[in-house]
A protein has these predicted regions:
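Sequence/structural segment immediately N-terminal to covalent heme-attachment motifs in c-type
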Residues: 1-18, 31, 116-142, 149-158
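Electrostatic cytochrome c docking/interface patches
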Residues: 1-8, 99-129, 170, 174-175, ...
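Short, solvent-exposed loop/turn and secondary-structure capping segments
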Residues: 17, 24-30, 51-53, 75-77, ...
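Extracytoplasmic electron-transfer domains, predominantly the class I c-type cytochrome c fold
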Residues: 30-78, 85-88, 92, 150-201, ...
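His/Cys-centered metal/cofactor-coordination and adjacent catalytic loops
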Residues: 21-31, 37-43, 99-117, 151, ...
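Sec/Tat-exported extracytoplasmic proteins
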Residues: 11, 16-19, 66-70, 78, ...
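Short pre-active-site segment immediately N-terminal to redox-active cysteine/selenocysteine motifs
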Residues: 8-14, 19, 70-73, 84, ...
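Extended surface/linker regions that mediate inter-domain or inter-protein docking
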Residues: 60, 77-123, 214
């Protein structure tokens, strides 16, 4: 019950609800008819993971999210001690029995094999076009792609979702560092139109870093 006390006492319950279904009294006003809404912990679809698409996040993934927060939506709970954060994580996991099963290991998350260069950024730009990324974030990555402008983007609950403005690093909800972007590209955001590109970059992970460098360059223009 101590774990639940922290969950209730730290305002988690106001957005995520007493039963962790994302239906707290404050949560319903965050974006009533569009995404993102507070996470429903009883579902097995999590956006921010280091595990393959379709898998639950690791404990470390949950710890990272609670510690860093989600820019524009959820505050950082760095004010909690590490032990208290782990207690909250244990309580969050209790809402879904699937967490009792063995969690898939995270994907490899290497350090960048090379520094950004004009050639790498140009190749990243070509990959951005090749994968059709421009239809959601747009040609310049500012979130104005045709699918987004037309209101065609929906999440798994059929809520309207807007493409991210990649030119604004503060809008990158899963982190804005090179490894954060690499992780997002390789795992995708389950429950959203953003798929995993791990399969496309199999055996050529180095090129994924070219895409990372291109995405980071968008915020420098």
């Amino acid at each position: 019950r101590e774990k639940g006390r922290l969950f209730d006492g730290r305002a988690c319950v106001w957005c995520h609800g007493a039963e962790g279904k994302g239906d707290g009294p404050a949560g319903r006003f965050i974006r009533r008819y569009s995404a993102p809404r507070p996470r429903d912990f009883t579902r097995e679809s999590y956006k921010f993971r280091s595990t393959p698409s379709g898998e639950l996040p690791t404990d470390q993934d949950l710890f990272r999210t609670i510690t860093q927060g989600i820019p524009g939506y959820m505050p950082s709970f760095h004010s909690l001690t590490e032990d208290e954060r782990w207690q909250v994580i244990a309580y969050v996991k209790s809402f879904n029995s699937a967490f009792k099963e063995e969690i898939s290991p995270p994907i490899p998350l290497p350090f960048p094999p090379h520094a950004p260069s004009d050639a790498a950024i140009e190749n990243g730009r070509k990959l951005y076009q090749q994968f059709g990324c421009q239809v959601c974030p747009g040609e310049n990555g500012v979130g104005d792609g045709p699918e987004s402008r037309a209101g065609h983007l929906r999440d798994a609950q059929n809520l309207l979702i807007s493409a991210t403005n990649l030119a604004d690093r503060s809008a990158l909800k899963n982190g804005a560092g090179p490894q954060d972007l690499y992780r997002s590209i390789m795992t995708g955001f389950d429950g959203t139109p953003m798929p995993s590109y791990g399969g496309q970059f199999a055996e050529r992970e180095q090129e994924a870093w070219d895409l990372v460098w291109y995405l980071l360059s968008l915020s420098e223009k």
